[in-house]
């Protein structure tokens, strides 16, 4: 799932973040989308992704489509969180 994907990426680099997308929406420091940097969490209603720059995110979309790159604004952004 989406939060498991972001949890695993951060964990692989030695960072601890909460497990669910709801909890991840509160971790780290909030920043404006206009200041987003690669590695920031982009939080949506019931979904979370990682910003990779250039207005793009990488995320676990669905079981059928798997991990994919999408435009960050493909749905309304609720929060941007900087963990690192």
PLM regions with names:
Residues 1-21:
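Secreted/periplasmic proteins that engage bacterial cell-wall peptidoglycan
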Residues 3-7, 36, 54:
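Extracytoplasmic/secreted envelope proteins and their assembly/folding machinery
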Residues 15-34, 46-48, 52-84:
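Aromatic- and glycine-rich peptidoglycan recognition patches
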């Amino acid at each position: 799932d989406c939060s498991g994907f972001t949890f695993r990426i951060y964990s692989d680099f030695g960072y601890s973040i909460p497990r669910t997308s709801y909890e991840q929406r509160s971790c780290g420091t909030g920043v404006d989308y206009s200041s987003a940097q690669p590695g920031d969490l982009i939080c949506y209603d019931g979904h979370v992704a990682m910003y990779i720059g250039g207005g793009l995110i990488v995320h676990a979309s669905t079981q059928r489509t798997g991990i994919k790159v999408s435009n960050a604004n493909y749905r309304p952004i609720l929060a941007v969180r900087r963990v690192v």
